[in-house]
A protein has these predicted regions:
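Solvent-exposed interhelical
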Residues: 131-157, 189-207
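Aromatic-anchored segments of alpha-helical transmembrane domains
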Residues: 17-24, 86-93, 109, 153-167, ...
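Loop-centered beta-sheet repeat module
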Residues: 147-194
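Structural signal for the C-terminal ends of transmembrane alpha-helices
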Residues: 64-71, 135-143, 164-165, 186-196, ...
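Interfacial loop-to-helix transition and helix-capping segments at the boundaries
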Residues: 42-55, 110-125, 164-183, 216-240, ...
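Alpha-helical transmembrane segments of multi-pass integral membrane proteins
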Residues: 96, 220-325, 342-345
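Juxtamembrane "helix-exit" motif on the non-cytosolic side of transmembrane helices
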Residues: 29-33, 96-103, 162-170, 216-225, ...
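Transmembrane alpha-helical segments and their boundary/interface "anchor" motifs
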Residues: 15, 40-41, 45-62, 66-120, ...
Length: 349
């Protein structure tokens, strides 16, 4: 059994808090309404940039923590039920509580099929990645270190360094399954080659802030936001640095290990279509009416409130799922699908 890394568990929670910051600034309307050139504009965009690598880091973790254990397909079925809960059940409950919410029958029906309808882009992309992980893992686990270094450099150059300006491989600036696959491979290869092993944590932190400041400086001075992208080499570098730093931490993880699995639910909670488009949309513009120190405090305060709200809702969901025995249903679905796939595979003989 693979030993649990509590540093990575802690990172998952930090990354989700960073995502909450991104959504407070972005969907909350702070960035779009800050006056260009003001201190508020500069500070909030810097906060955005240092948090932007969170999504990349999540996918990198999946590869970095690559396991020799057999993939459990029940995990993806459980995840589908989780996504269904946040897409349809939460929307249905909100509609019942507030009948004036502008949501039609067709929209509710689309929420019943969240993966097919790409309700949560990351989850649709992750489902695709999950399906091909069994194909990727045998090679990623066995590849020799020298070969892994060559592939790591090649993937970084082709899909990030060269691609972020023109995106010839249709990664849609990172909002796609193909980018998650690349990140998964990069994470696994980084672990194999022991990336930055010789560098001190302090050095990595300096690299992180230099990368962030460079991205921020280019945007502020040249109004060029090309580097503020999931496929940007500097954002990717930041994501990798965080994974490496936190993987080094030696922690007693009793509390962390209980909270870490709740992180995905926090993301799904705030990305629920109604919450995203009605309750978060431009809700935090008023922050800009205060002095910069209060503005910063309010950004972190509202990000914390979103984080805690999602944490509580996810905890309730887990208890509800335990009550209705979703785990057993997932087992039966996996068993049924396995039989169907086995029978279909016989047709290929």
């Amino acid at each position: 059994m693979d030993k649990r890394n509590y540093g990575i568990d802690l990172l998952r929670l930090l990354l989700m808090f960073m995502v909450c910051i991104l959504h407070t600034l972005g969907q909350g309307g702070v960035l779009n309404n800050a006056i260009v050139g003001t201190t508020s504009y500069k500070i909030h965009w810097f906060t955005e940039i240092i948090s932007y690598c969170a999504v990349d880091s999540f996918a990198l973790i999946s590869g970095y923590m690559i396991s020799k254990n057999k993939l459990k397909y029940k995990k993806i079925i459980n995840m589908w039920f989780q996504v269904f809960f946040y897409s349809f059940i939460i929307s249905f409950i909100i509609k019942i509580i507030n009948i004036n919410i502008p949501i039609g029958k067709n929209e509710l029906i689309s929420y019943m099929f969240p993966i097919l309808n790409n309700i949560f882009w990351y989850m649709s992309a992750y489902f695709g990645l999950f399906i091909i992980i069994p194909i990727l893992n045998p090679y990623l686990l066995k590849v020799k270190k020298d070969t892994a270094k060559k592939y790591f450099v090649s993937l970084f150059i082709i899909f990030s360094l060269l691609a972020y300006t023109k995106d010839p491989f249709k990664t849609t600036t990172g909002y796609s399954m193909i980018w998650l696959v690349i990140l998964y491979c990069l994470g696994a290869l980084a672990n194999k080659i022991e990336l930055f092993k010789q560098k001190k944590t302090s050095t990595l932190l300096i690299m992180y802030f230099i990368s962030s400041i460079t991205t921020w400086f280019i945007y502020m001075c040249f109004n060029n936001d090309k580097l503020i992208s999931y496929i940007s080499p500097l954002i990717l570098l930041n994501g990798m640095i965080l994974v490496i730093i936190f993987s080094r931490l030696k922690l007693n993880g009793k509390i962390i290990s209980k909270l870490s699995p709740l992180a995905l639910g926090i993301y799904l909670f705030q990305l629920n279509s109604i919450i995203w488009n009605i309750y978060l949309k431009d809700r935090f513009i008023f922050i800009l009416n205060y002095n910069i120190f209060i503005e910063i405090a309010l950004v972190f305060l509202f990000a914390t409130l979103i984080f805690i709200s999602g944490l509580v809702v996810e905890y309730i969901r887990i208890k509800l799922f335990e009550l209705v025995k979703i785990e057993k249903l997932s087992d039966k679905i996996v068993e049924c699908l396995s039989k169907i796939i086995n029978k279909l595979s016989l047709l290929l003989n």
